[in-house]
Design a protein with these regions (language model features):
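Metal-dependent enolase-superfamily TIM-barrel catalytic cores that perform enediolate-based chemistry
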Residues: 130-240
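Solvent-exposed alpha-helices and their adjacent loops that cap or buttress functional pockets
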Residues: 29-32, 124-127, 195-197
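Conserved, mostly hydrophobic/aromatic
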Residues: 3, 45, 66, 104, ...
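Structured beta-strand/loop patches that form or line metal/cofactor-binding pockets in enzymes
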Residues: 1-50
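Glycine-rich, charged/polar anion/phosphate-binding loops
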Residues: 22-25, 119-120, 154-155
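Glycine-rich, aromatic-flanked loop segments that form ligand/cofactor-binding clefts
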Residues: 105-145
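Metal- or metallocofactor-binding catalytic centers and their adjacent structured scaffolds
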Residues: 41-116
Length: 240
């Protein structure tokens, strides 16, 4: 089943999510945001879709790499297509990113699932038919309606538990917030959430690599006392 075409459609949709200068998401006034839909079509008309930021799948990337590699290949040969794209990465001057490759792979899996009338989880082995979900906060901020204090984190966590979540991951304050990172304030937010939700909810935190080694060690020891299950990306890997 050969691939016949690769196309991208950019569309707008209403959202109340805004991004700061570091790319972190926060609540905001309703506005229009852009999204791109990548469509891979096979010769029999089967289609697969994925959704990406428009800048990741911009026309140059689609024309210079996606179409050059994909058109004419068997849509089921995902690993071969992946390796062929990787071959072009080194000389792409960072145009063909890992994110771009991931959206191609997602669309190919979607195409296979639609063609075979099977969910992708069955195509990759079917070990589980369900997975646990966790609620996730946005990053801390100083915005109205956002997460500006430990108490607001606690209140948001209570809302997530009321919706049925058994686990929660926190994203605390990060640059460009003026006072971030602030390890002691982050620990206060973690403690407030633990007190609010009780001992039976699994808690996690994503440090987004802002802490130093000593700060990460301090936070890790405090999280251990609070029985947190996971401390994600506490510092830059180069800091090891």
């Amino acid at each position: 089943m050969k691939i016949e075409s690769v196309n991208v459609t950019v569309f707008t949709y209403p959202t109340r999510r805004v991004s700061d200068s570091a790319g972190h998401s926060h609540p905001g006034e309703e506005s229009l945001a852009k999204m791109a839909m990548l469509t891979i079509t096979a010769e029999d008309g089967s289609k697969g879709y994925s959704f990406a930021p428009p800048e990741v799948v911009r026309p140059f990337v689609v024309n210079a790499f996606f179409r050059k590699v994909l058109v004419g290949q068997d849509a089921f040969n995902r690993e071969r297509i992946w390796q062929d794209l990787v071959h072009w990465q080194r000389g792409s001057a960072h145009q063909l990113t890992e994110r771009a490759l991931s959206f191609v792979e997602q669309a190919l899996w979607d195409l296979a699932g639609r063609k075979l009338n099977l969910p992708v989880w069955k195509l990759i082995g079917g070990y589980r038919d369900r997975v646990p979900a966790y609620g996730s906060t946005m990053c801390g901020d100083e915005l109205k309606g956002g997460l500006s204090t430990p108490d607001e984190y606690a209140q948001f966590a209570e809302t997530l538990v009321a919706r049925g979540y058994k686990a929660i991951k926190l994203h605390t304050w990060m640059p460009p917030v003026a006072f971030a990172p602030n390890p002691k304030m982050d620990v206060k937010a973690c403690a407030a959430v633990r007190e609010a939700v009780g001992p039976d909810i699994d808690l996690m935190i994503d440090g987004y690599h802002w802490y130093s080694r000593t700060e990460a060690l301090y936070i890790g020891k405090e999280l251990e006392k609070l029985n947190f299950a996971w401390f994600e990306e506490p510092m830059e890997e180069e800091s090891m």
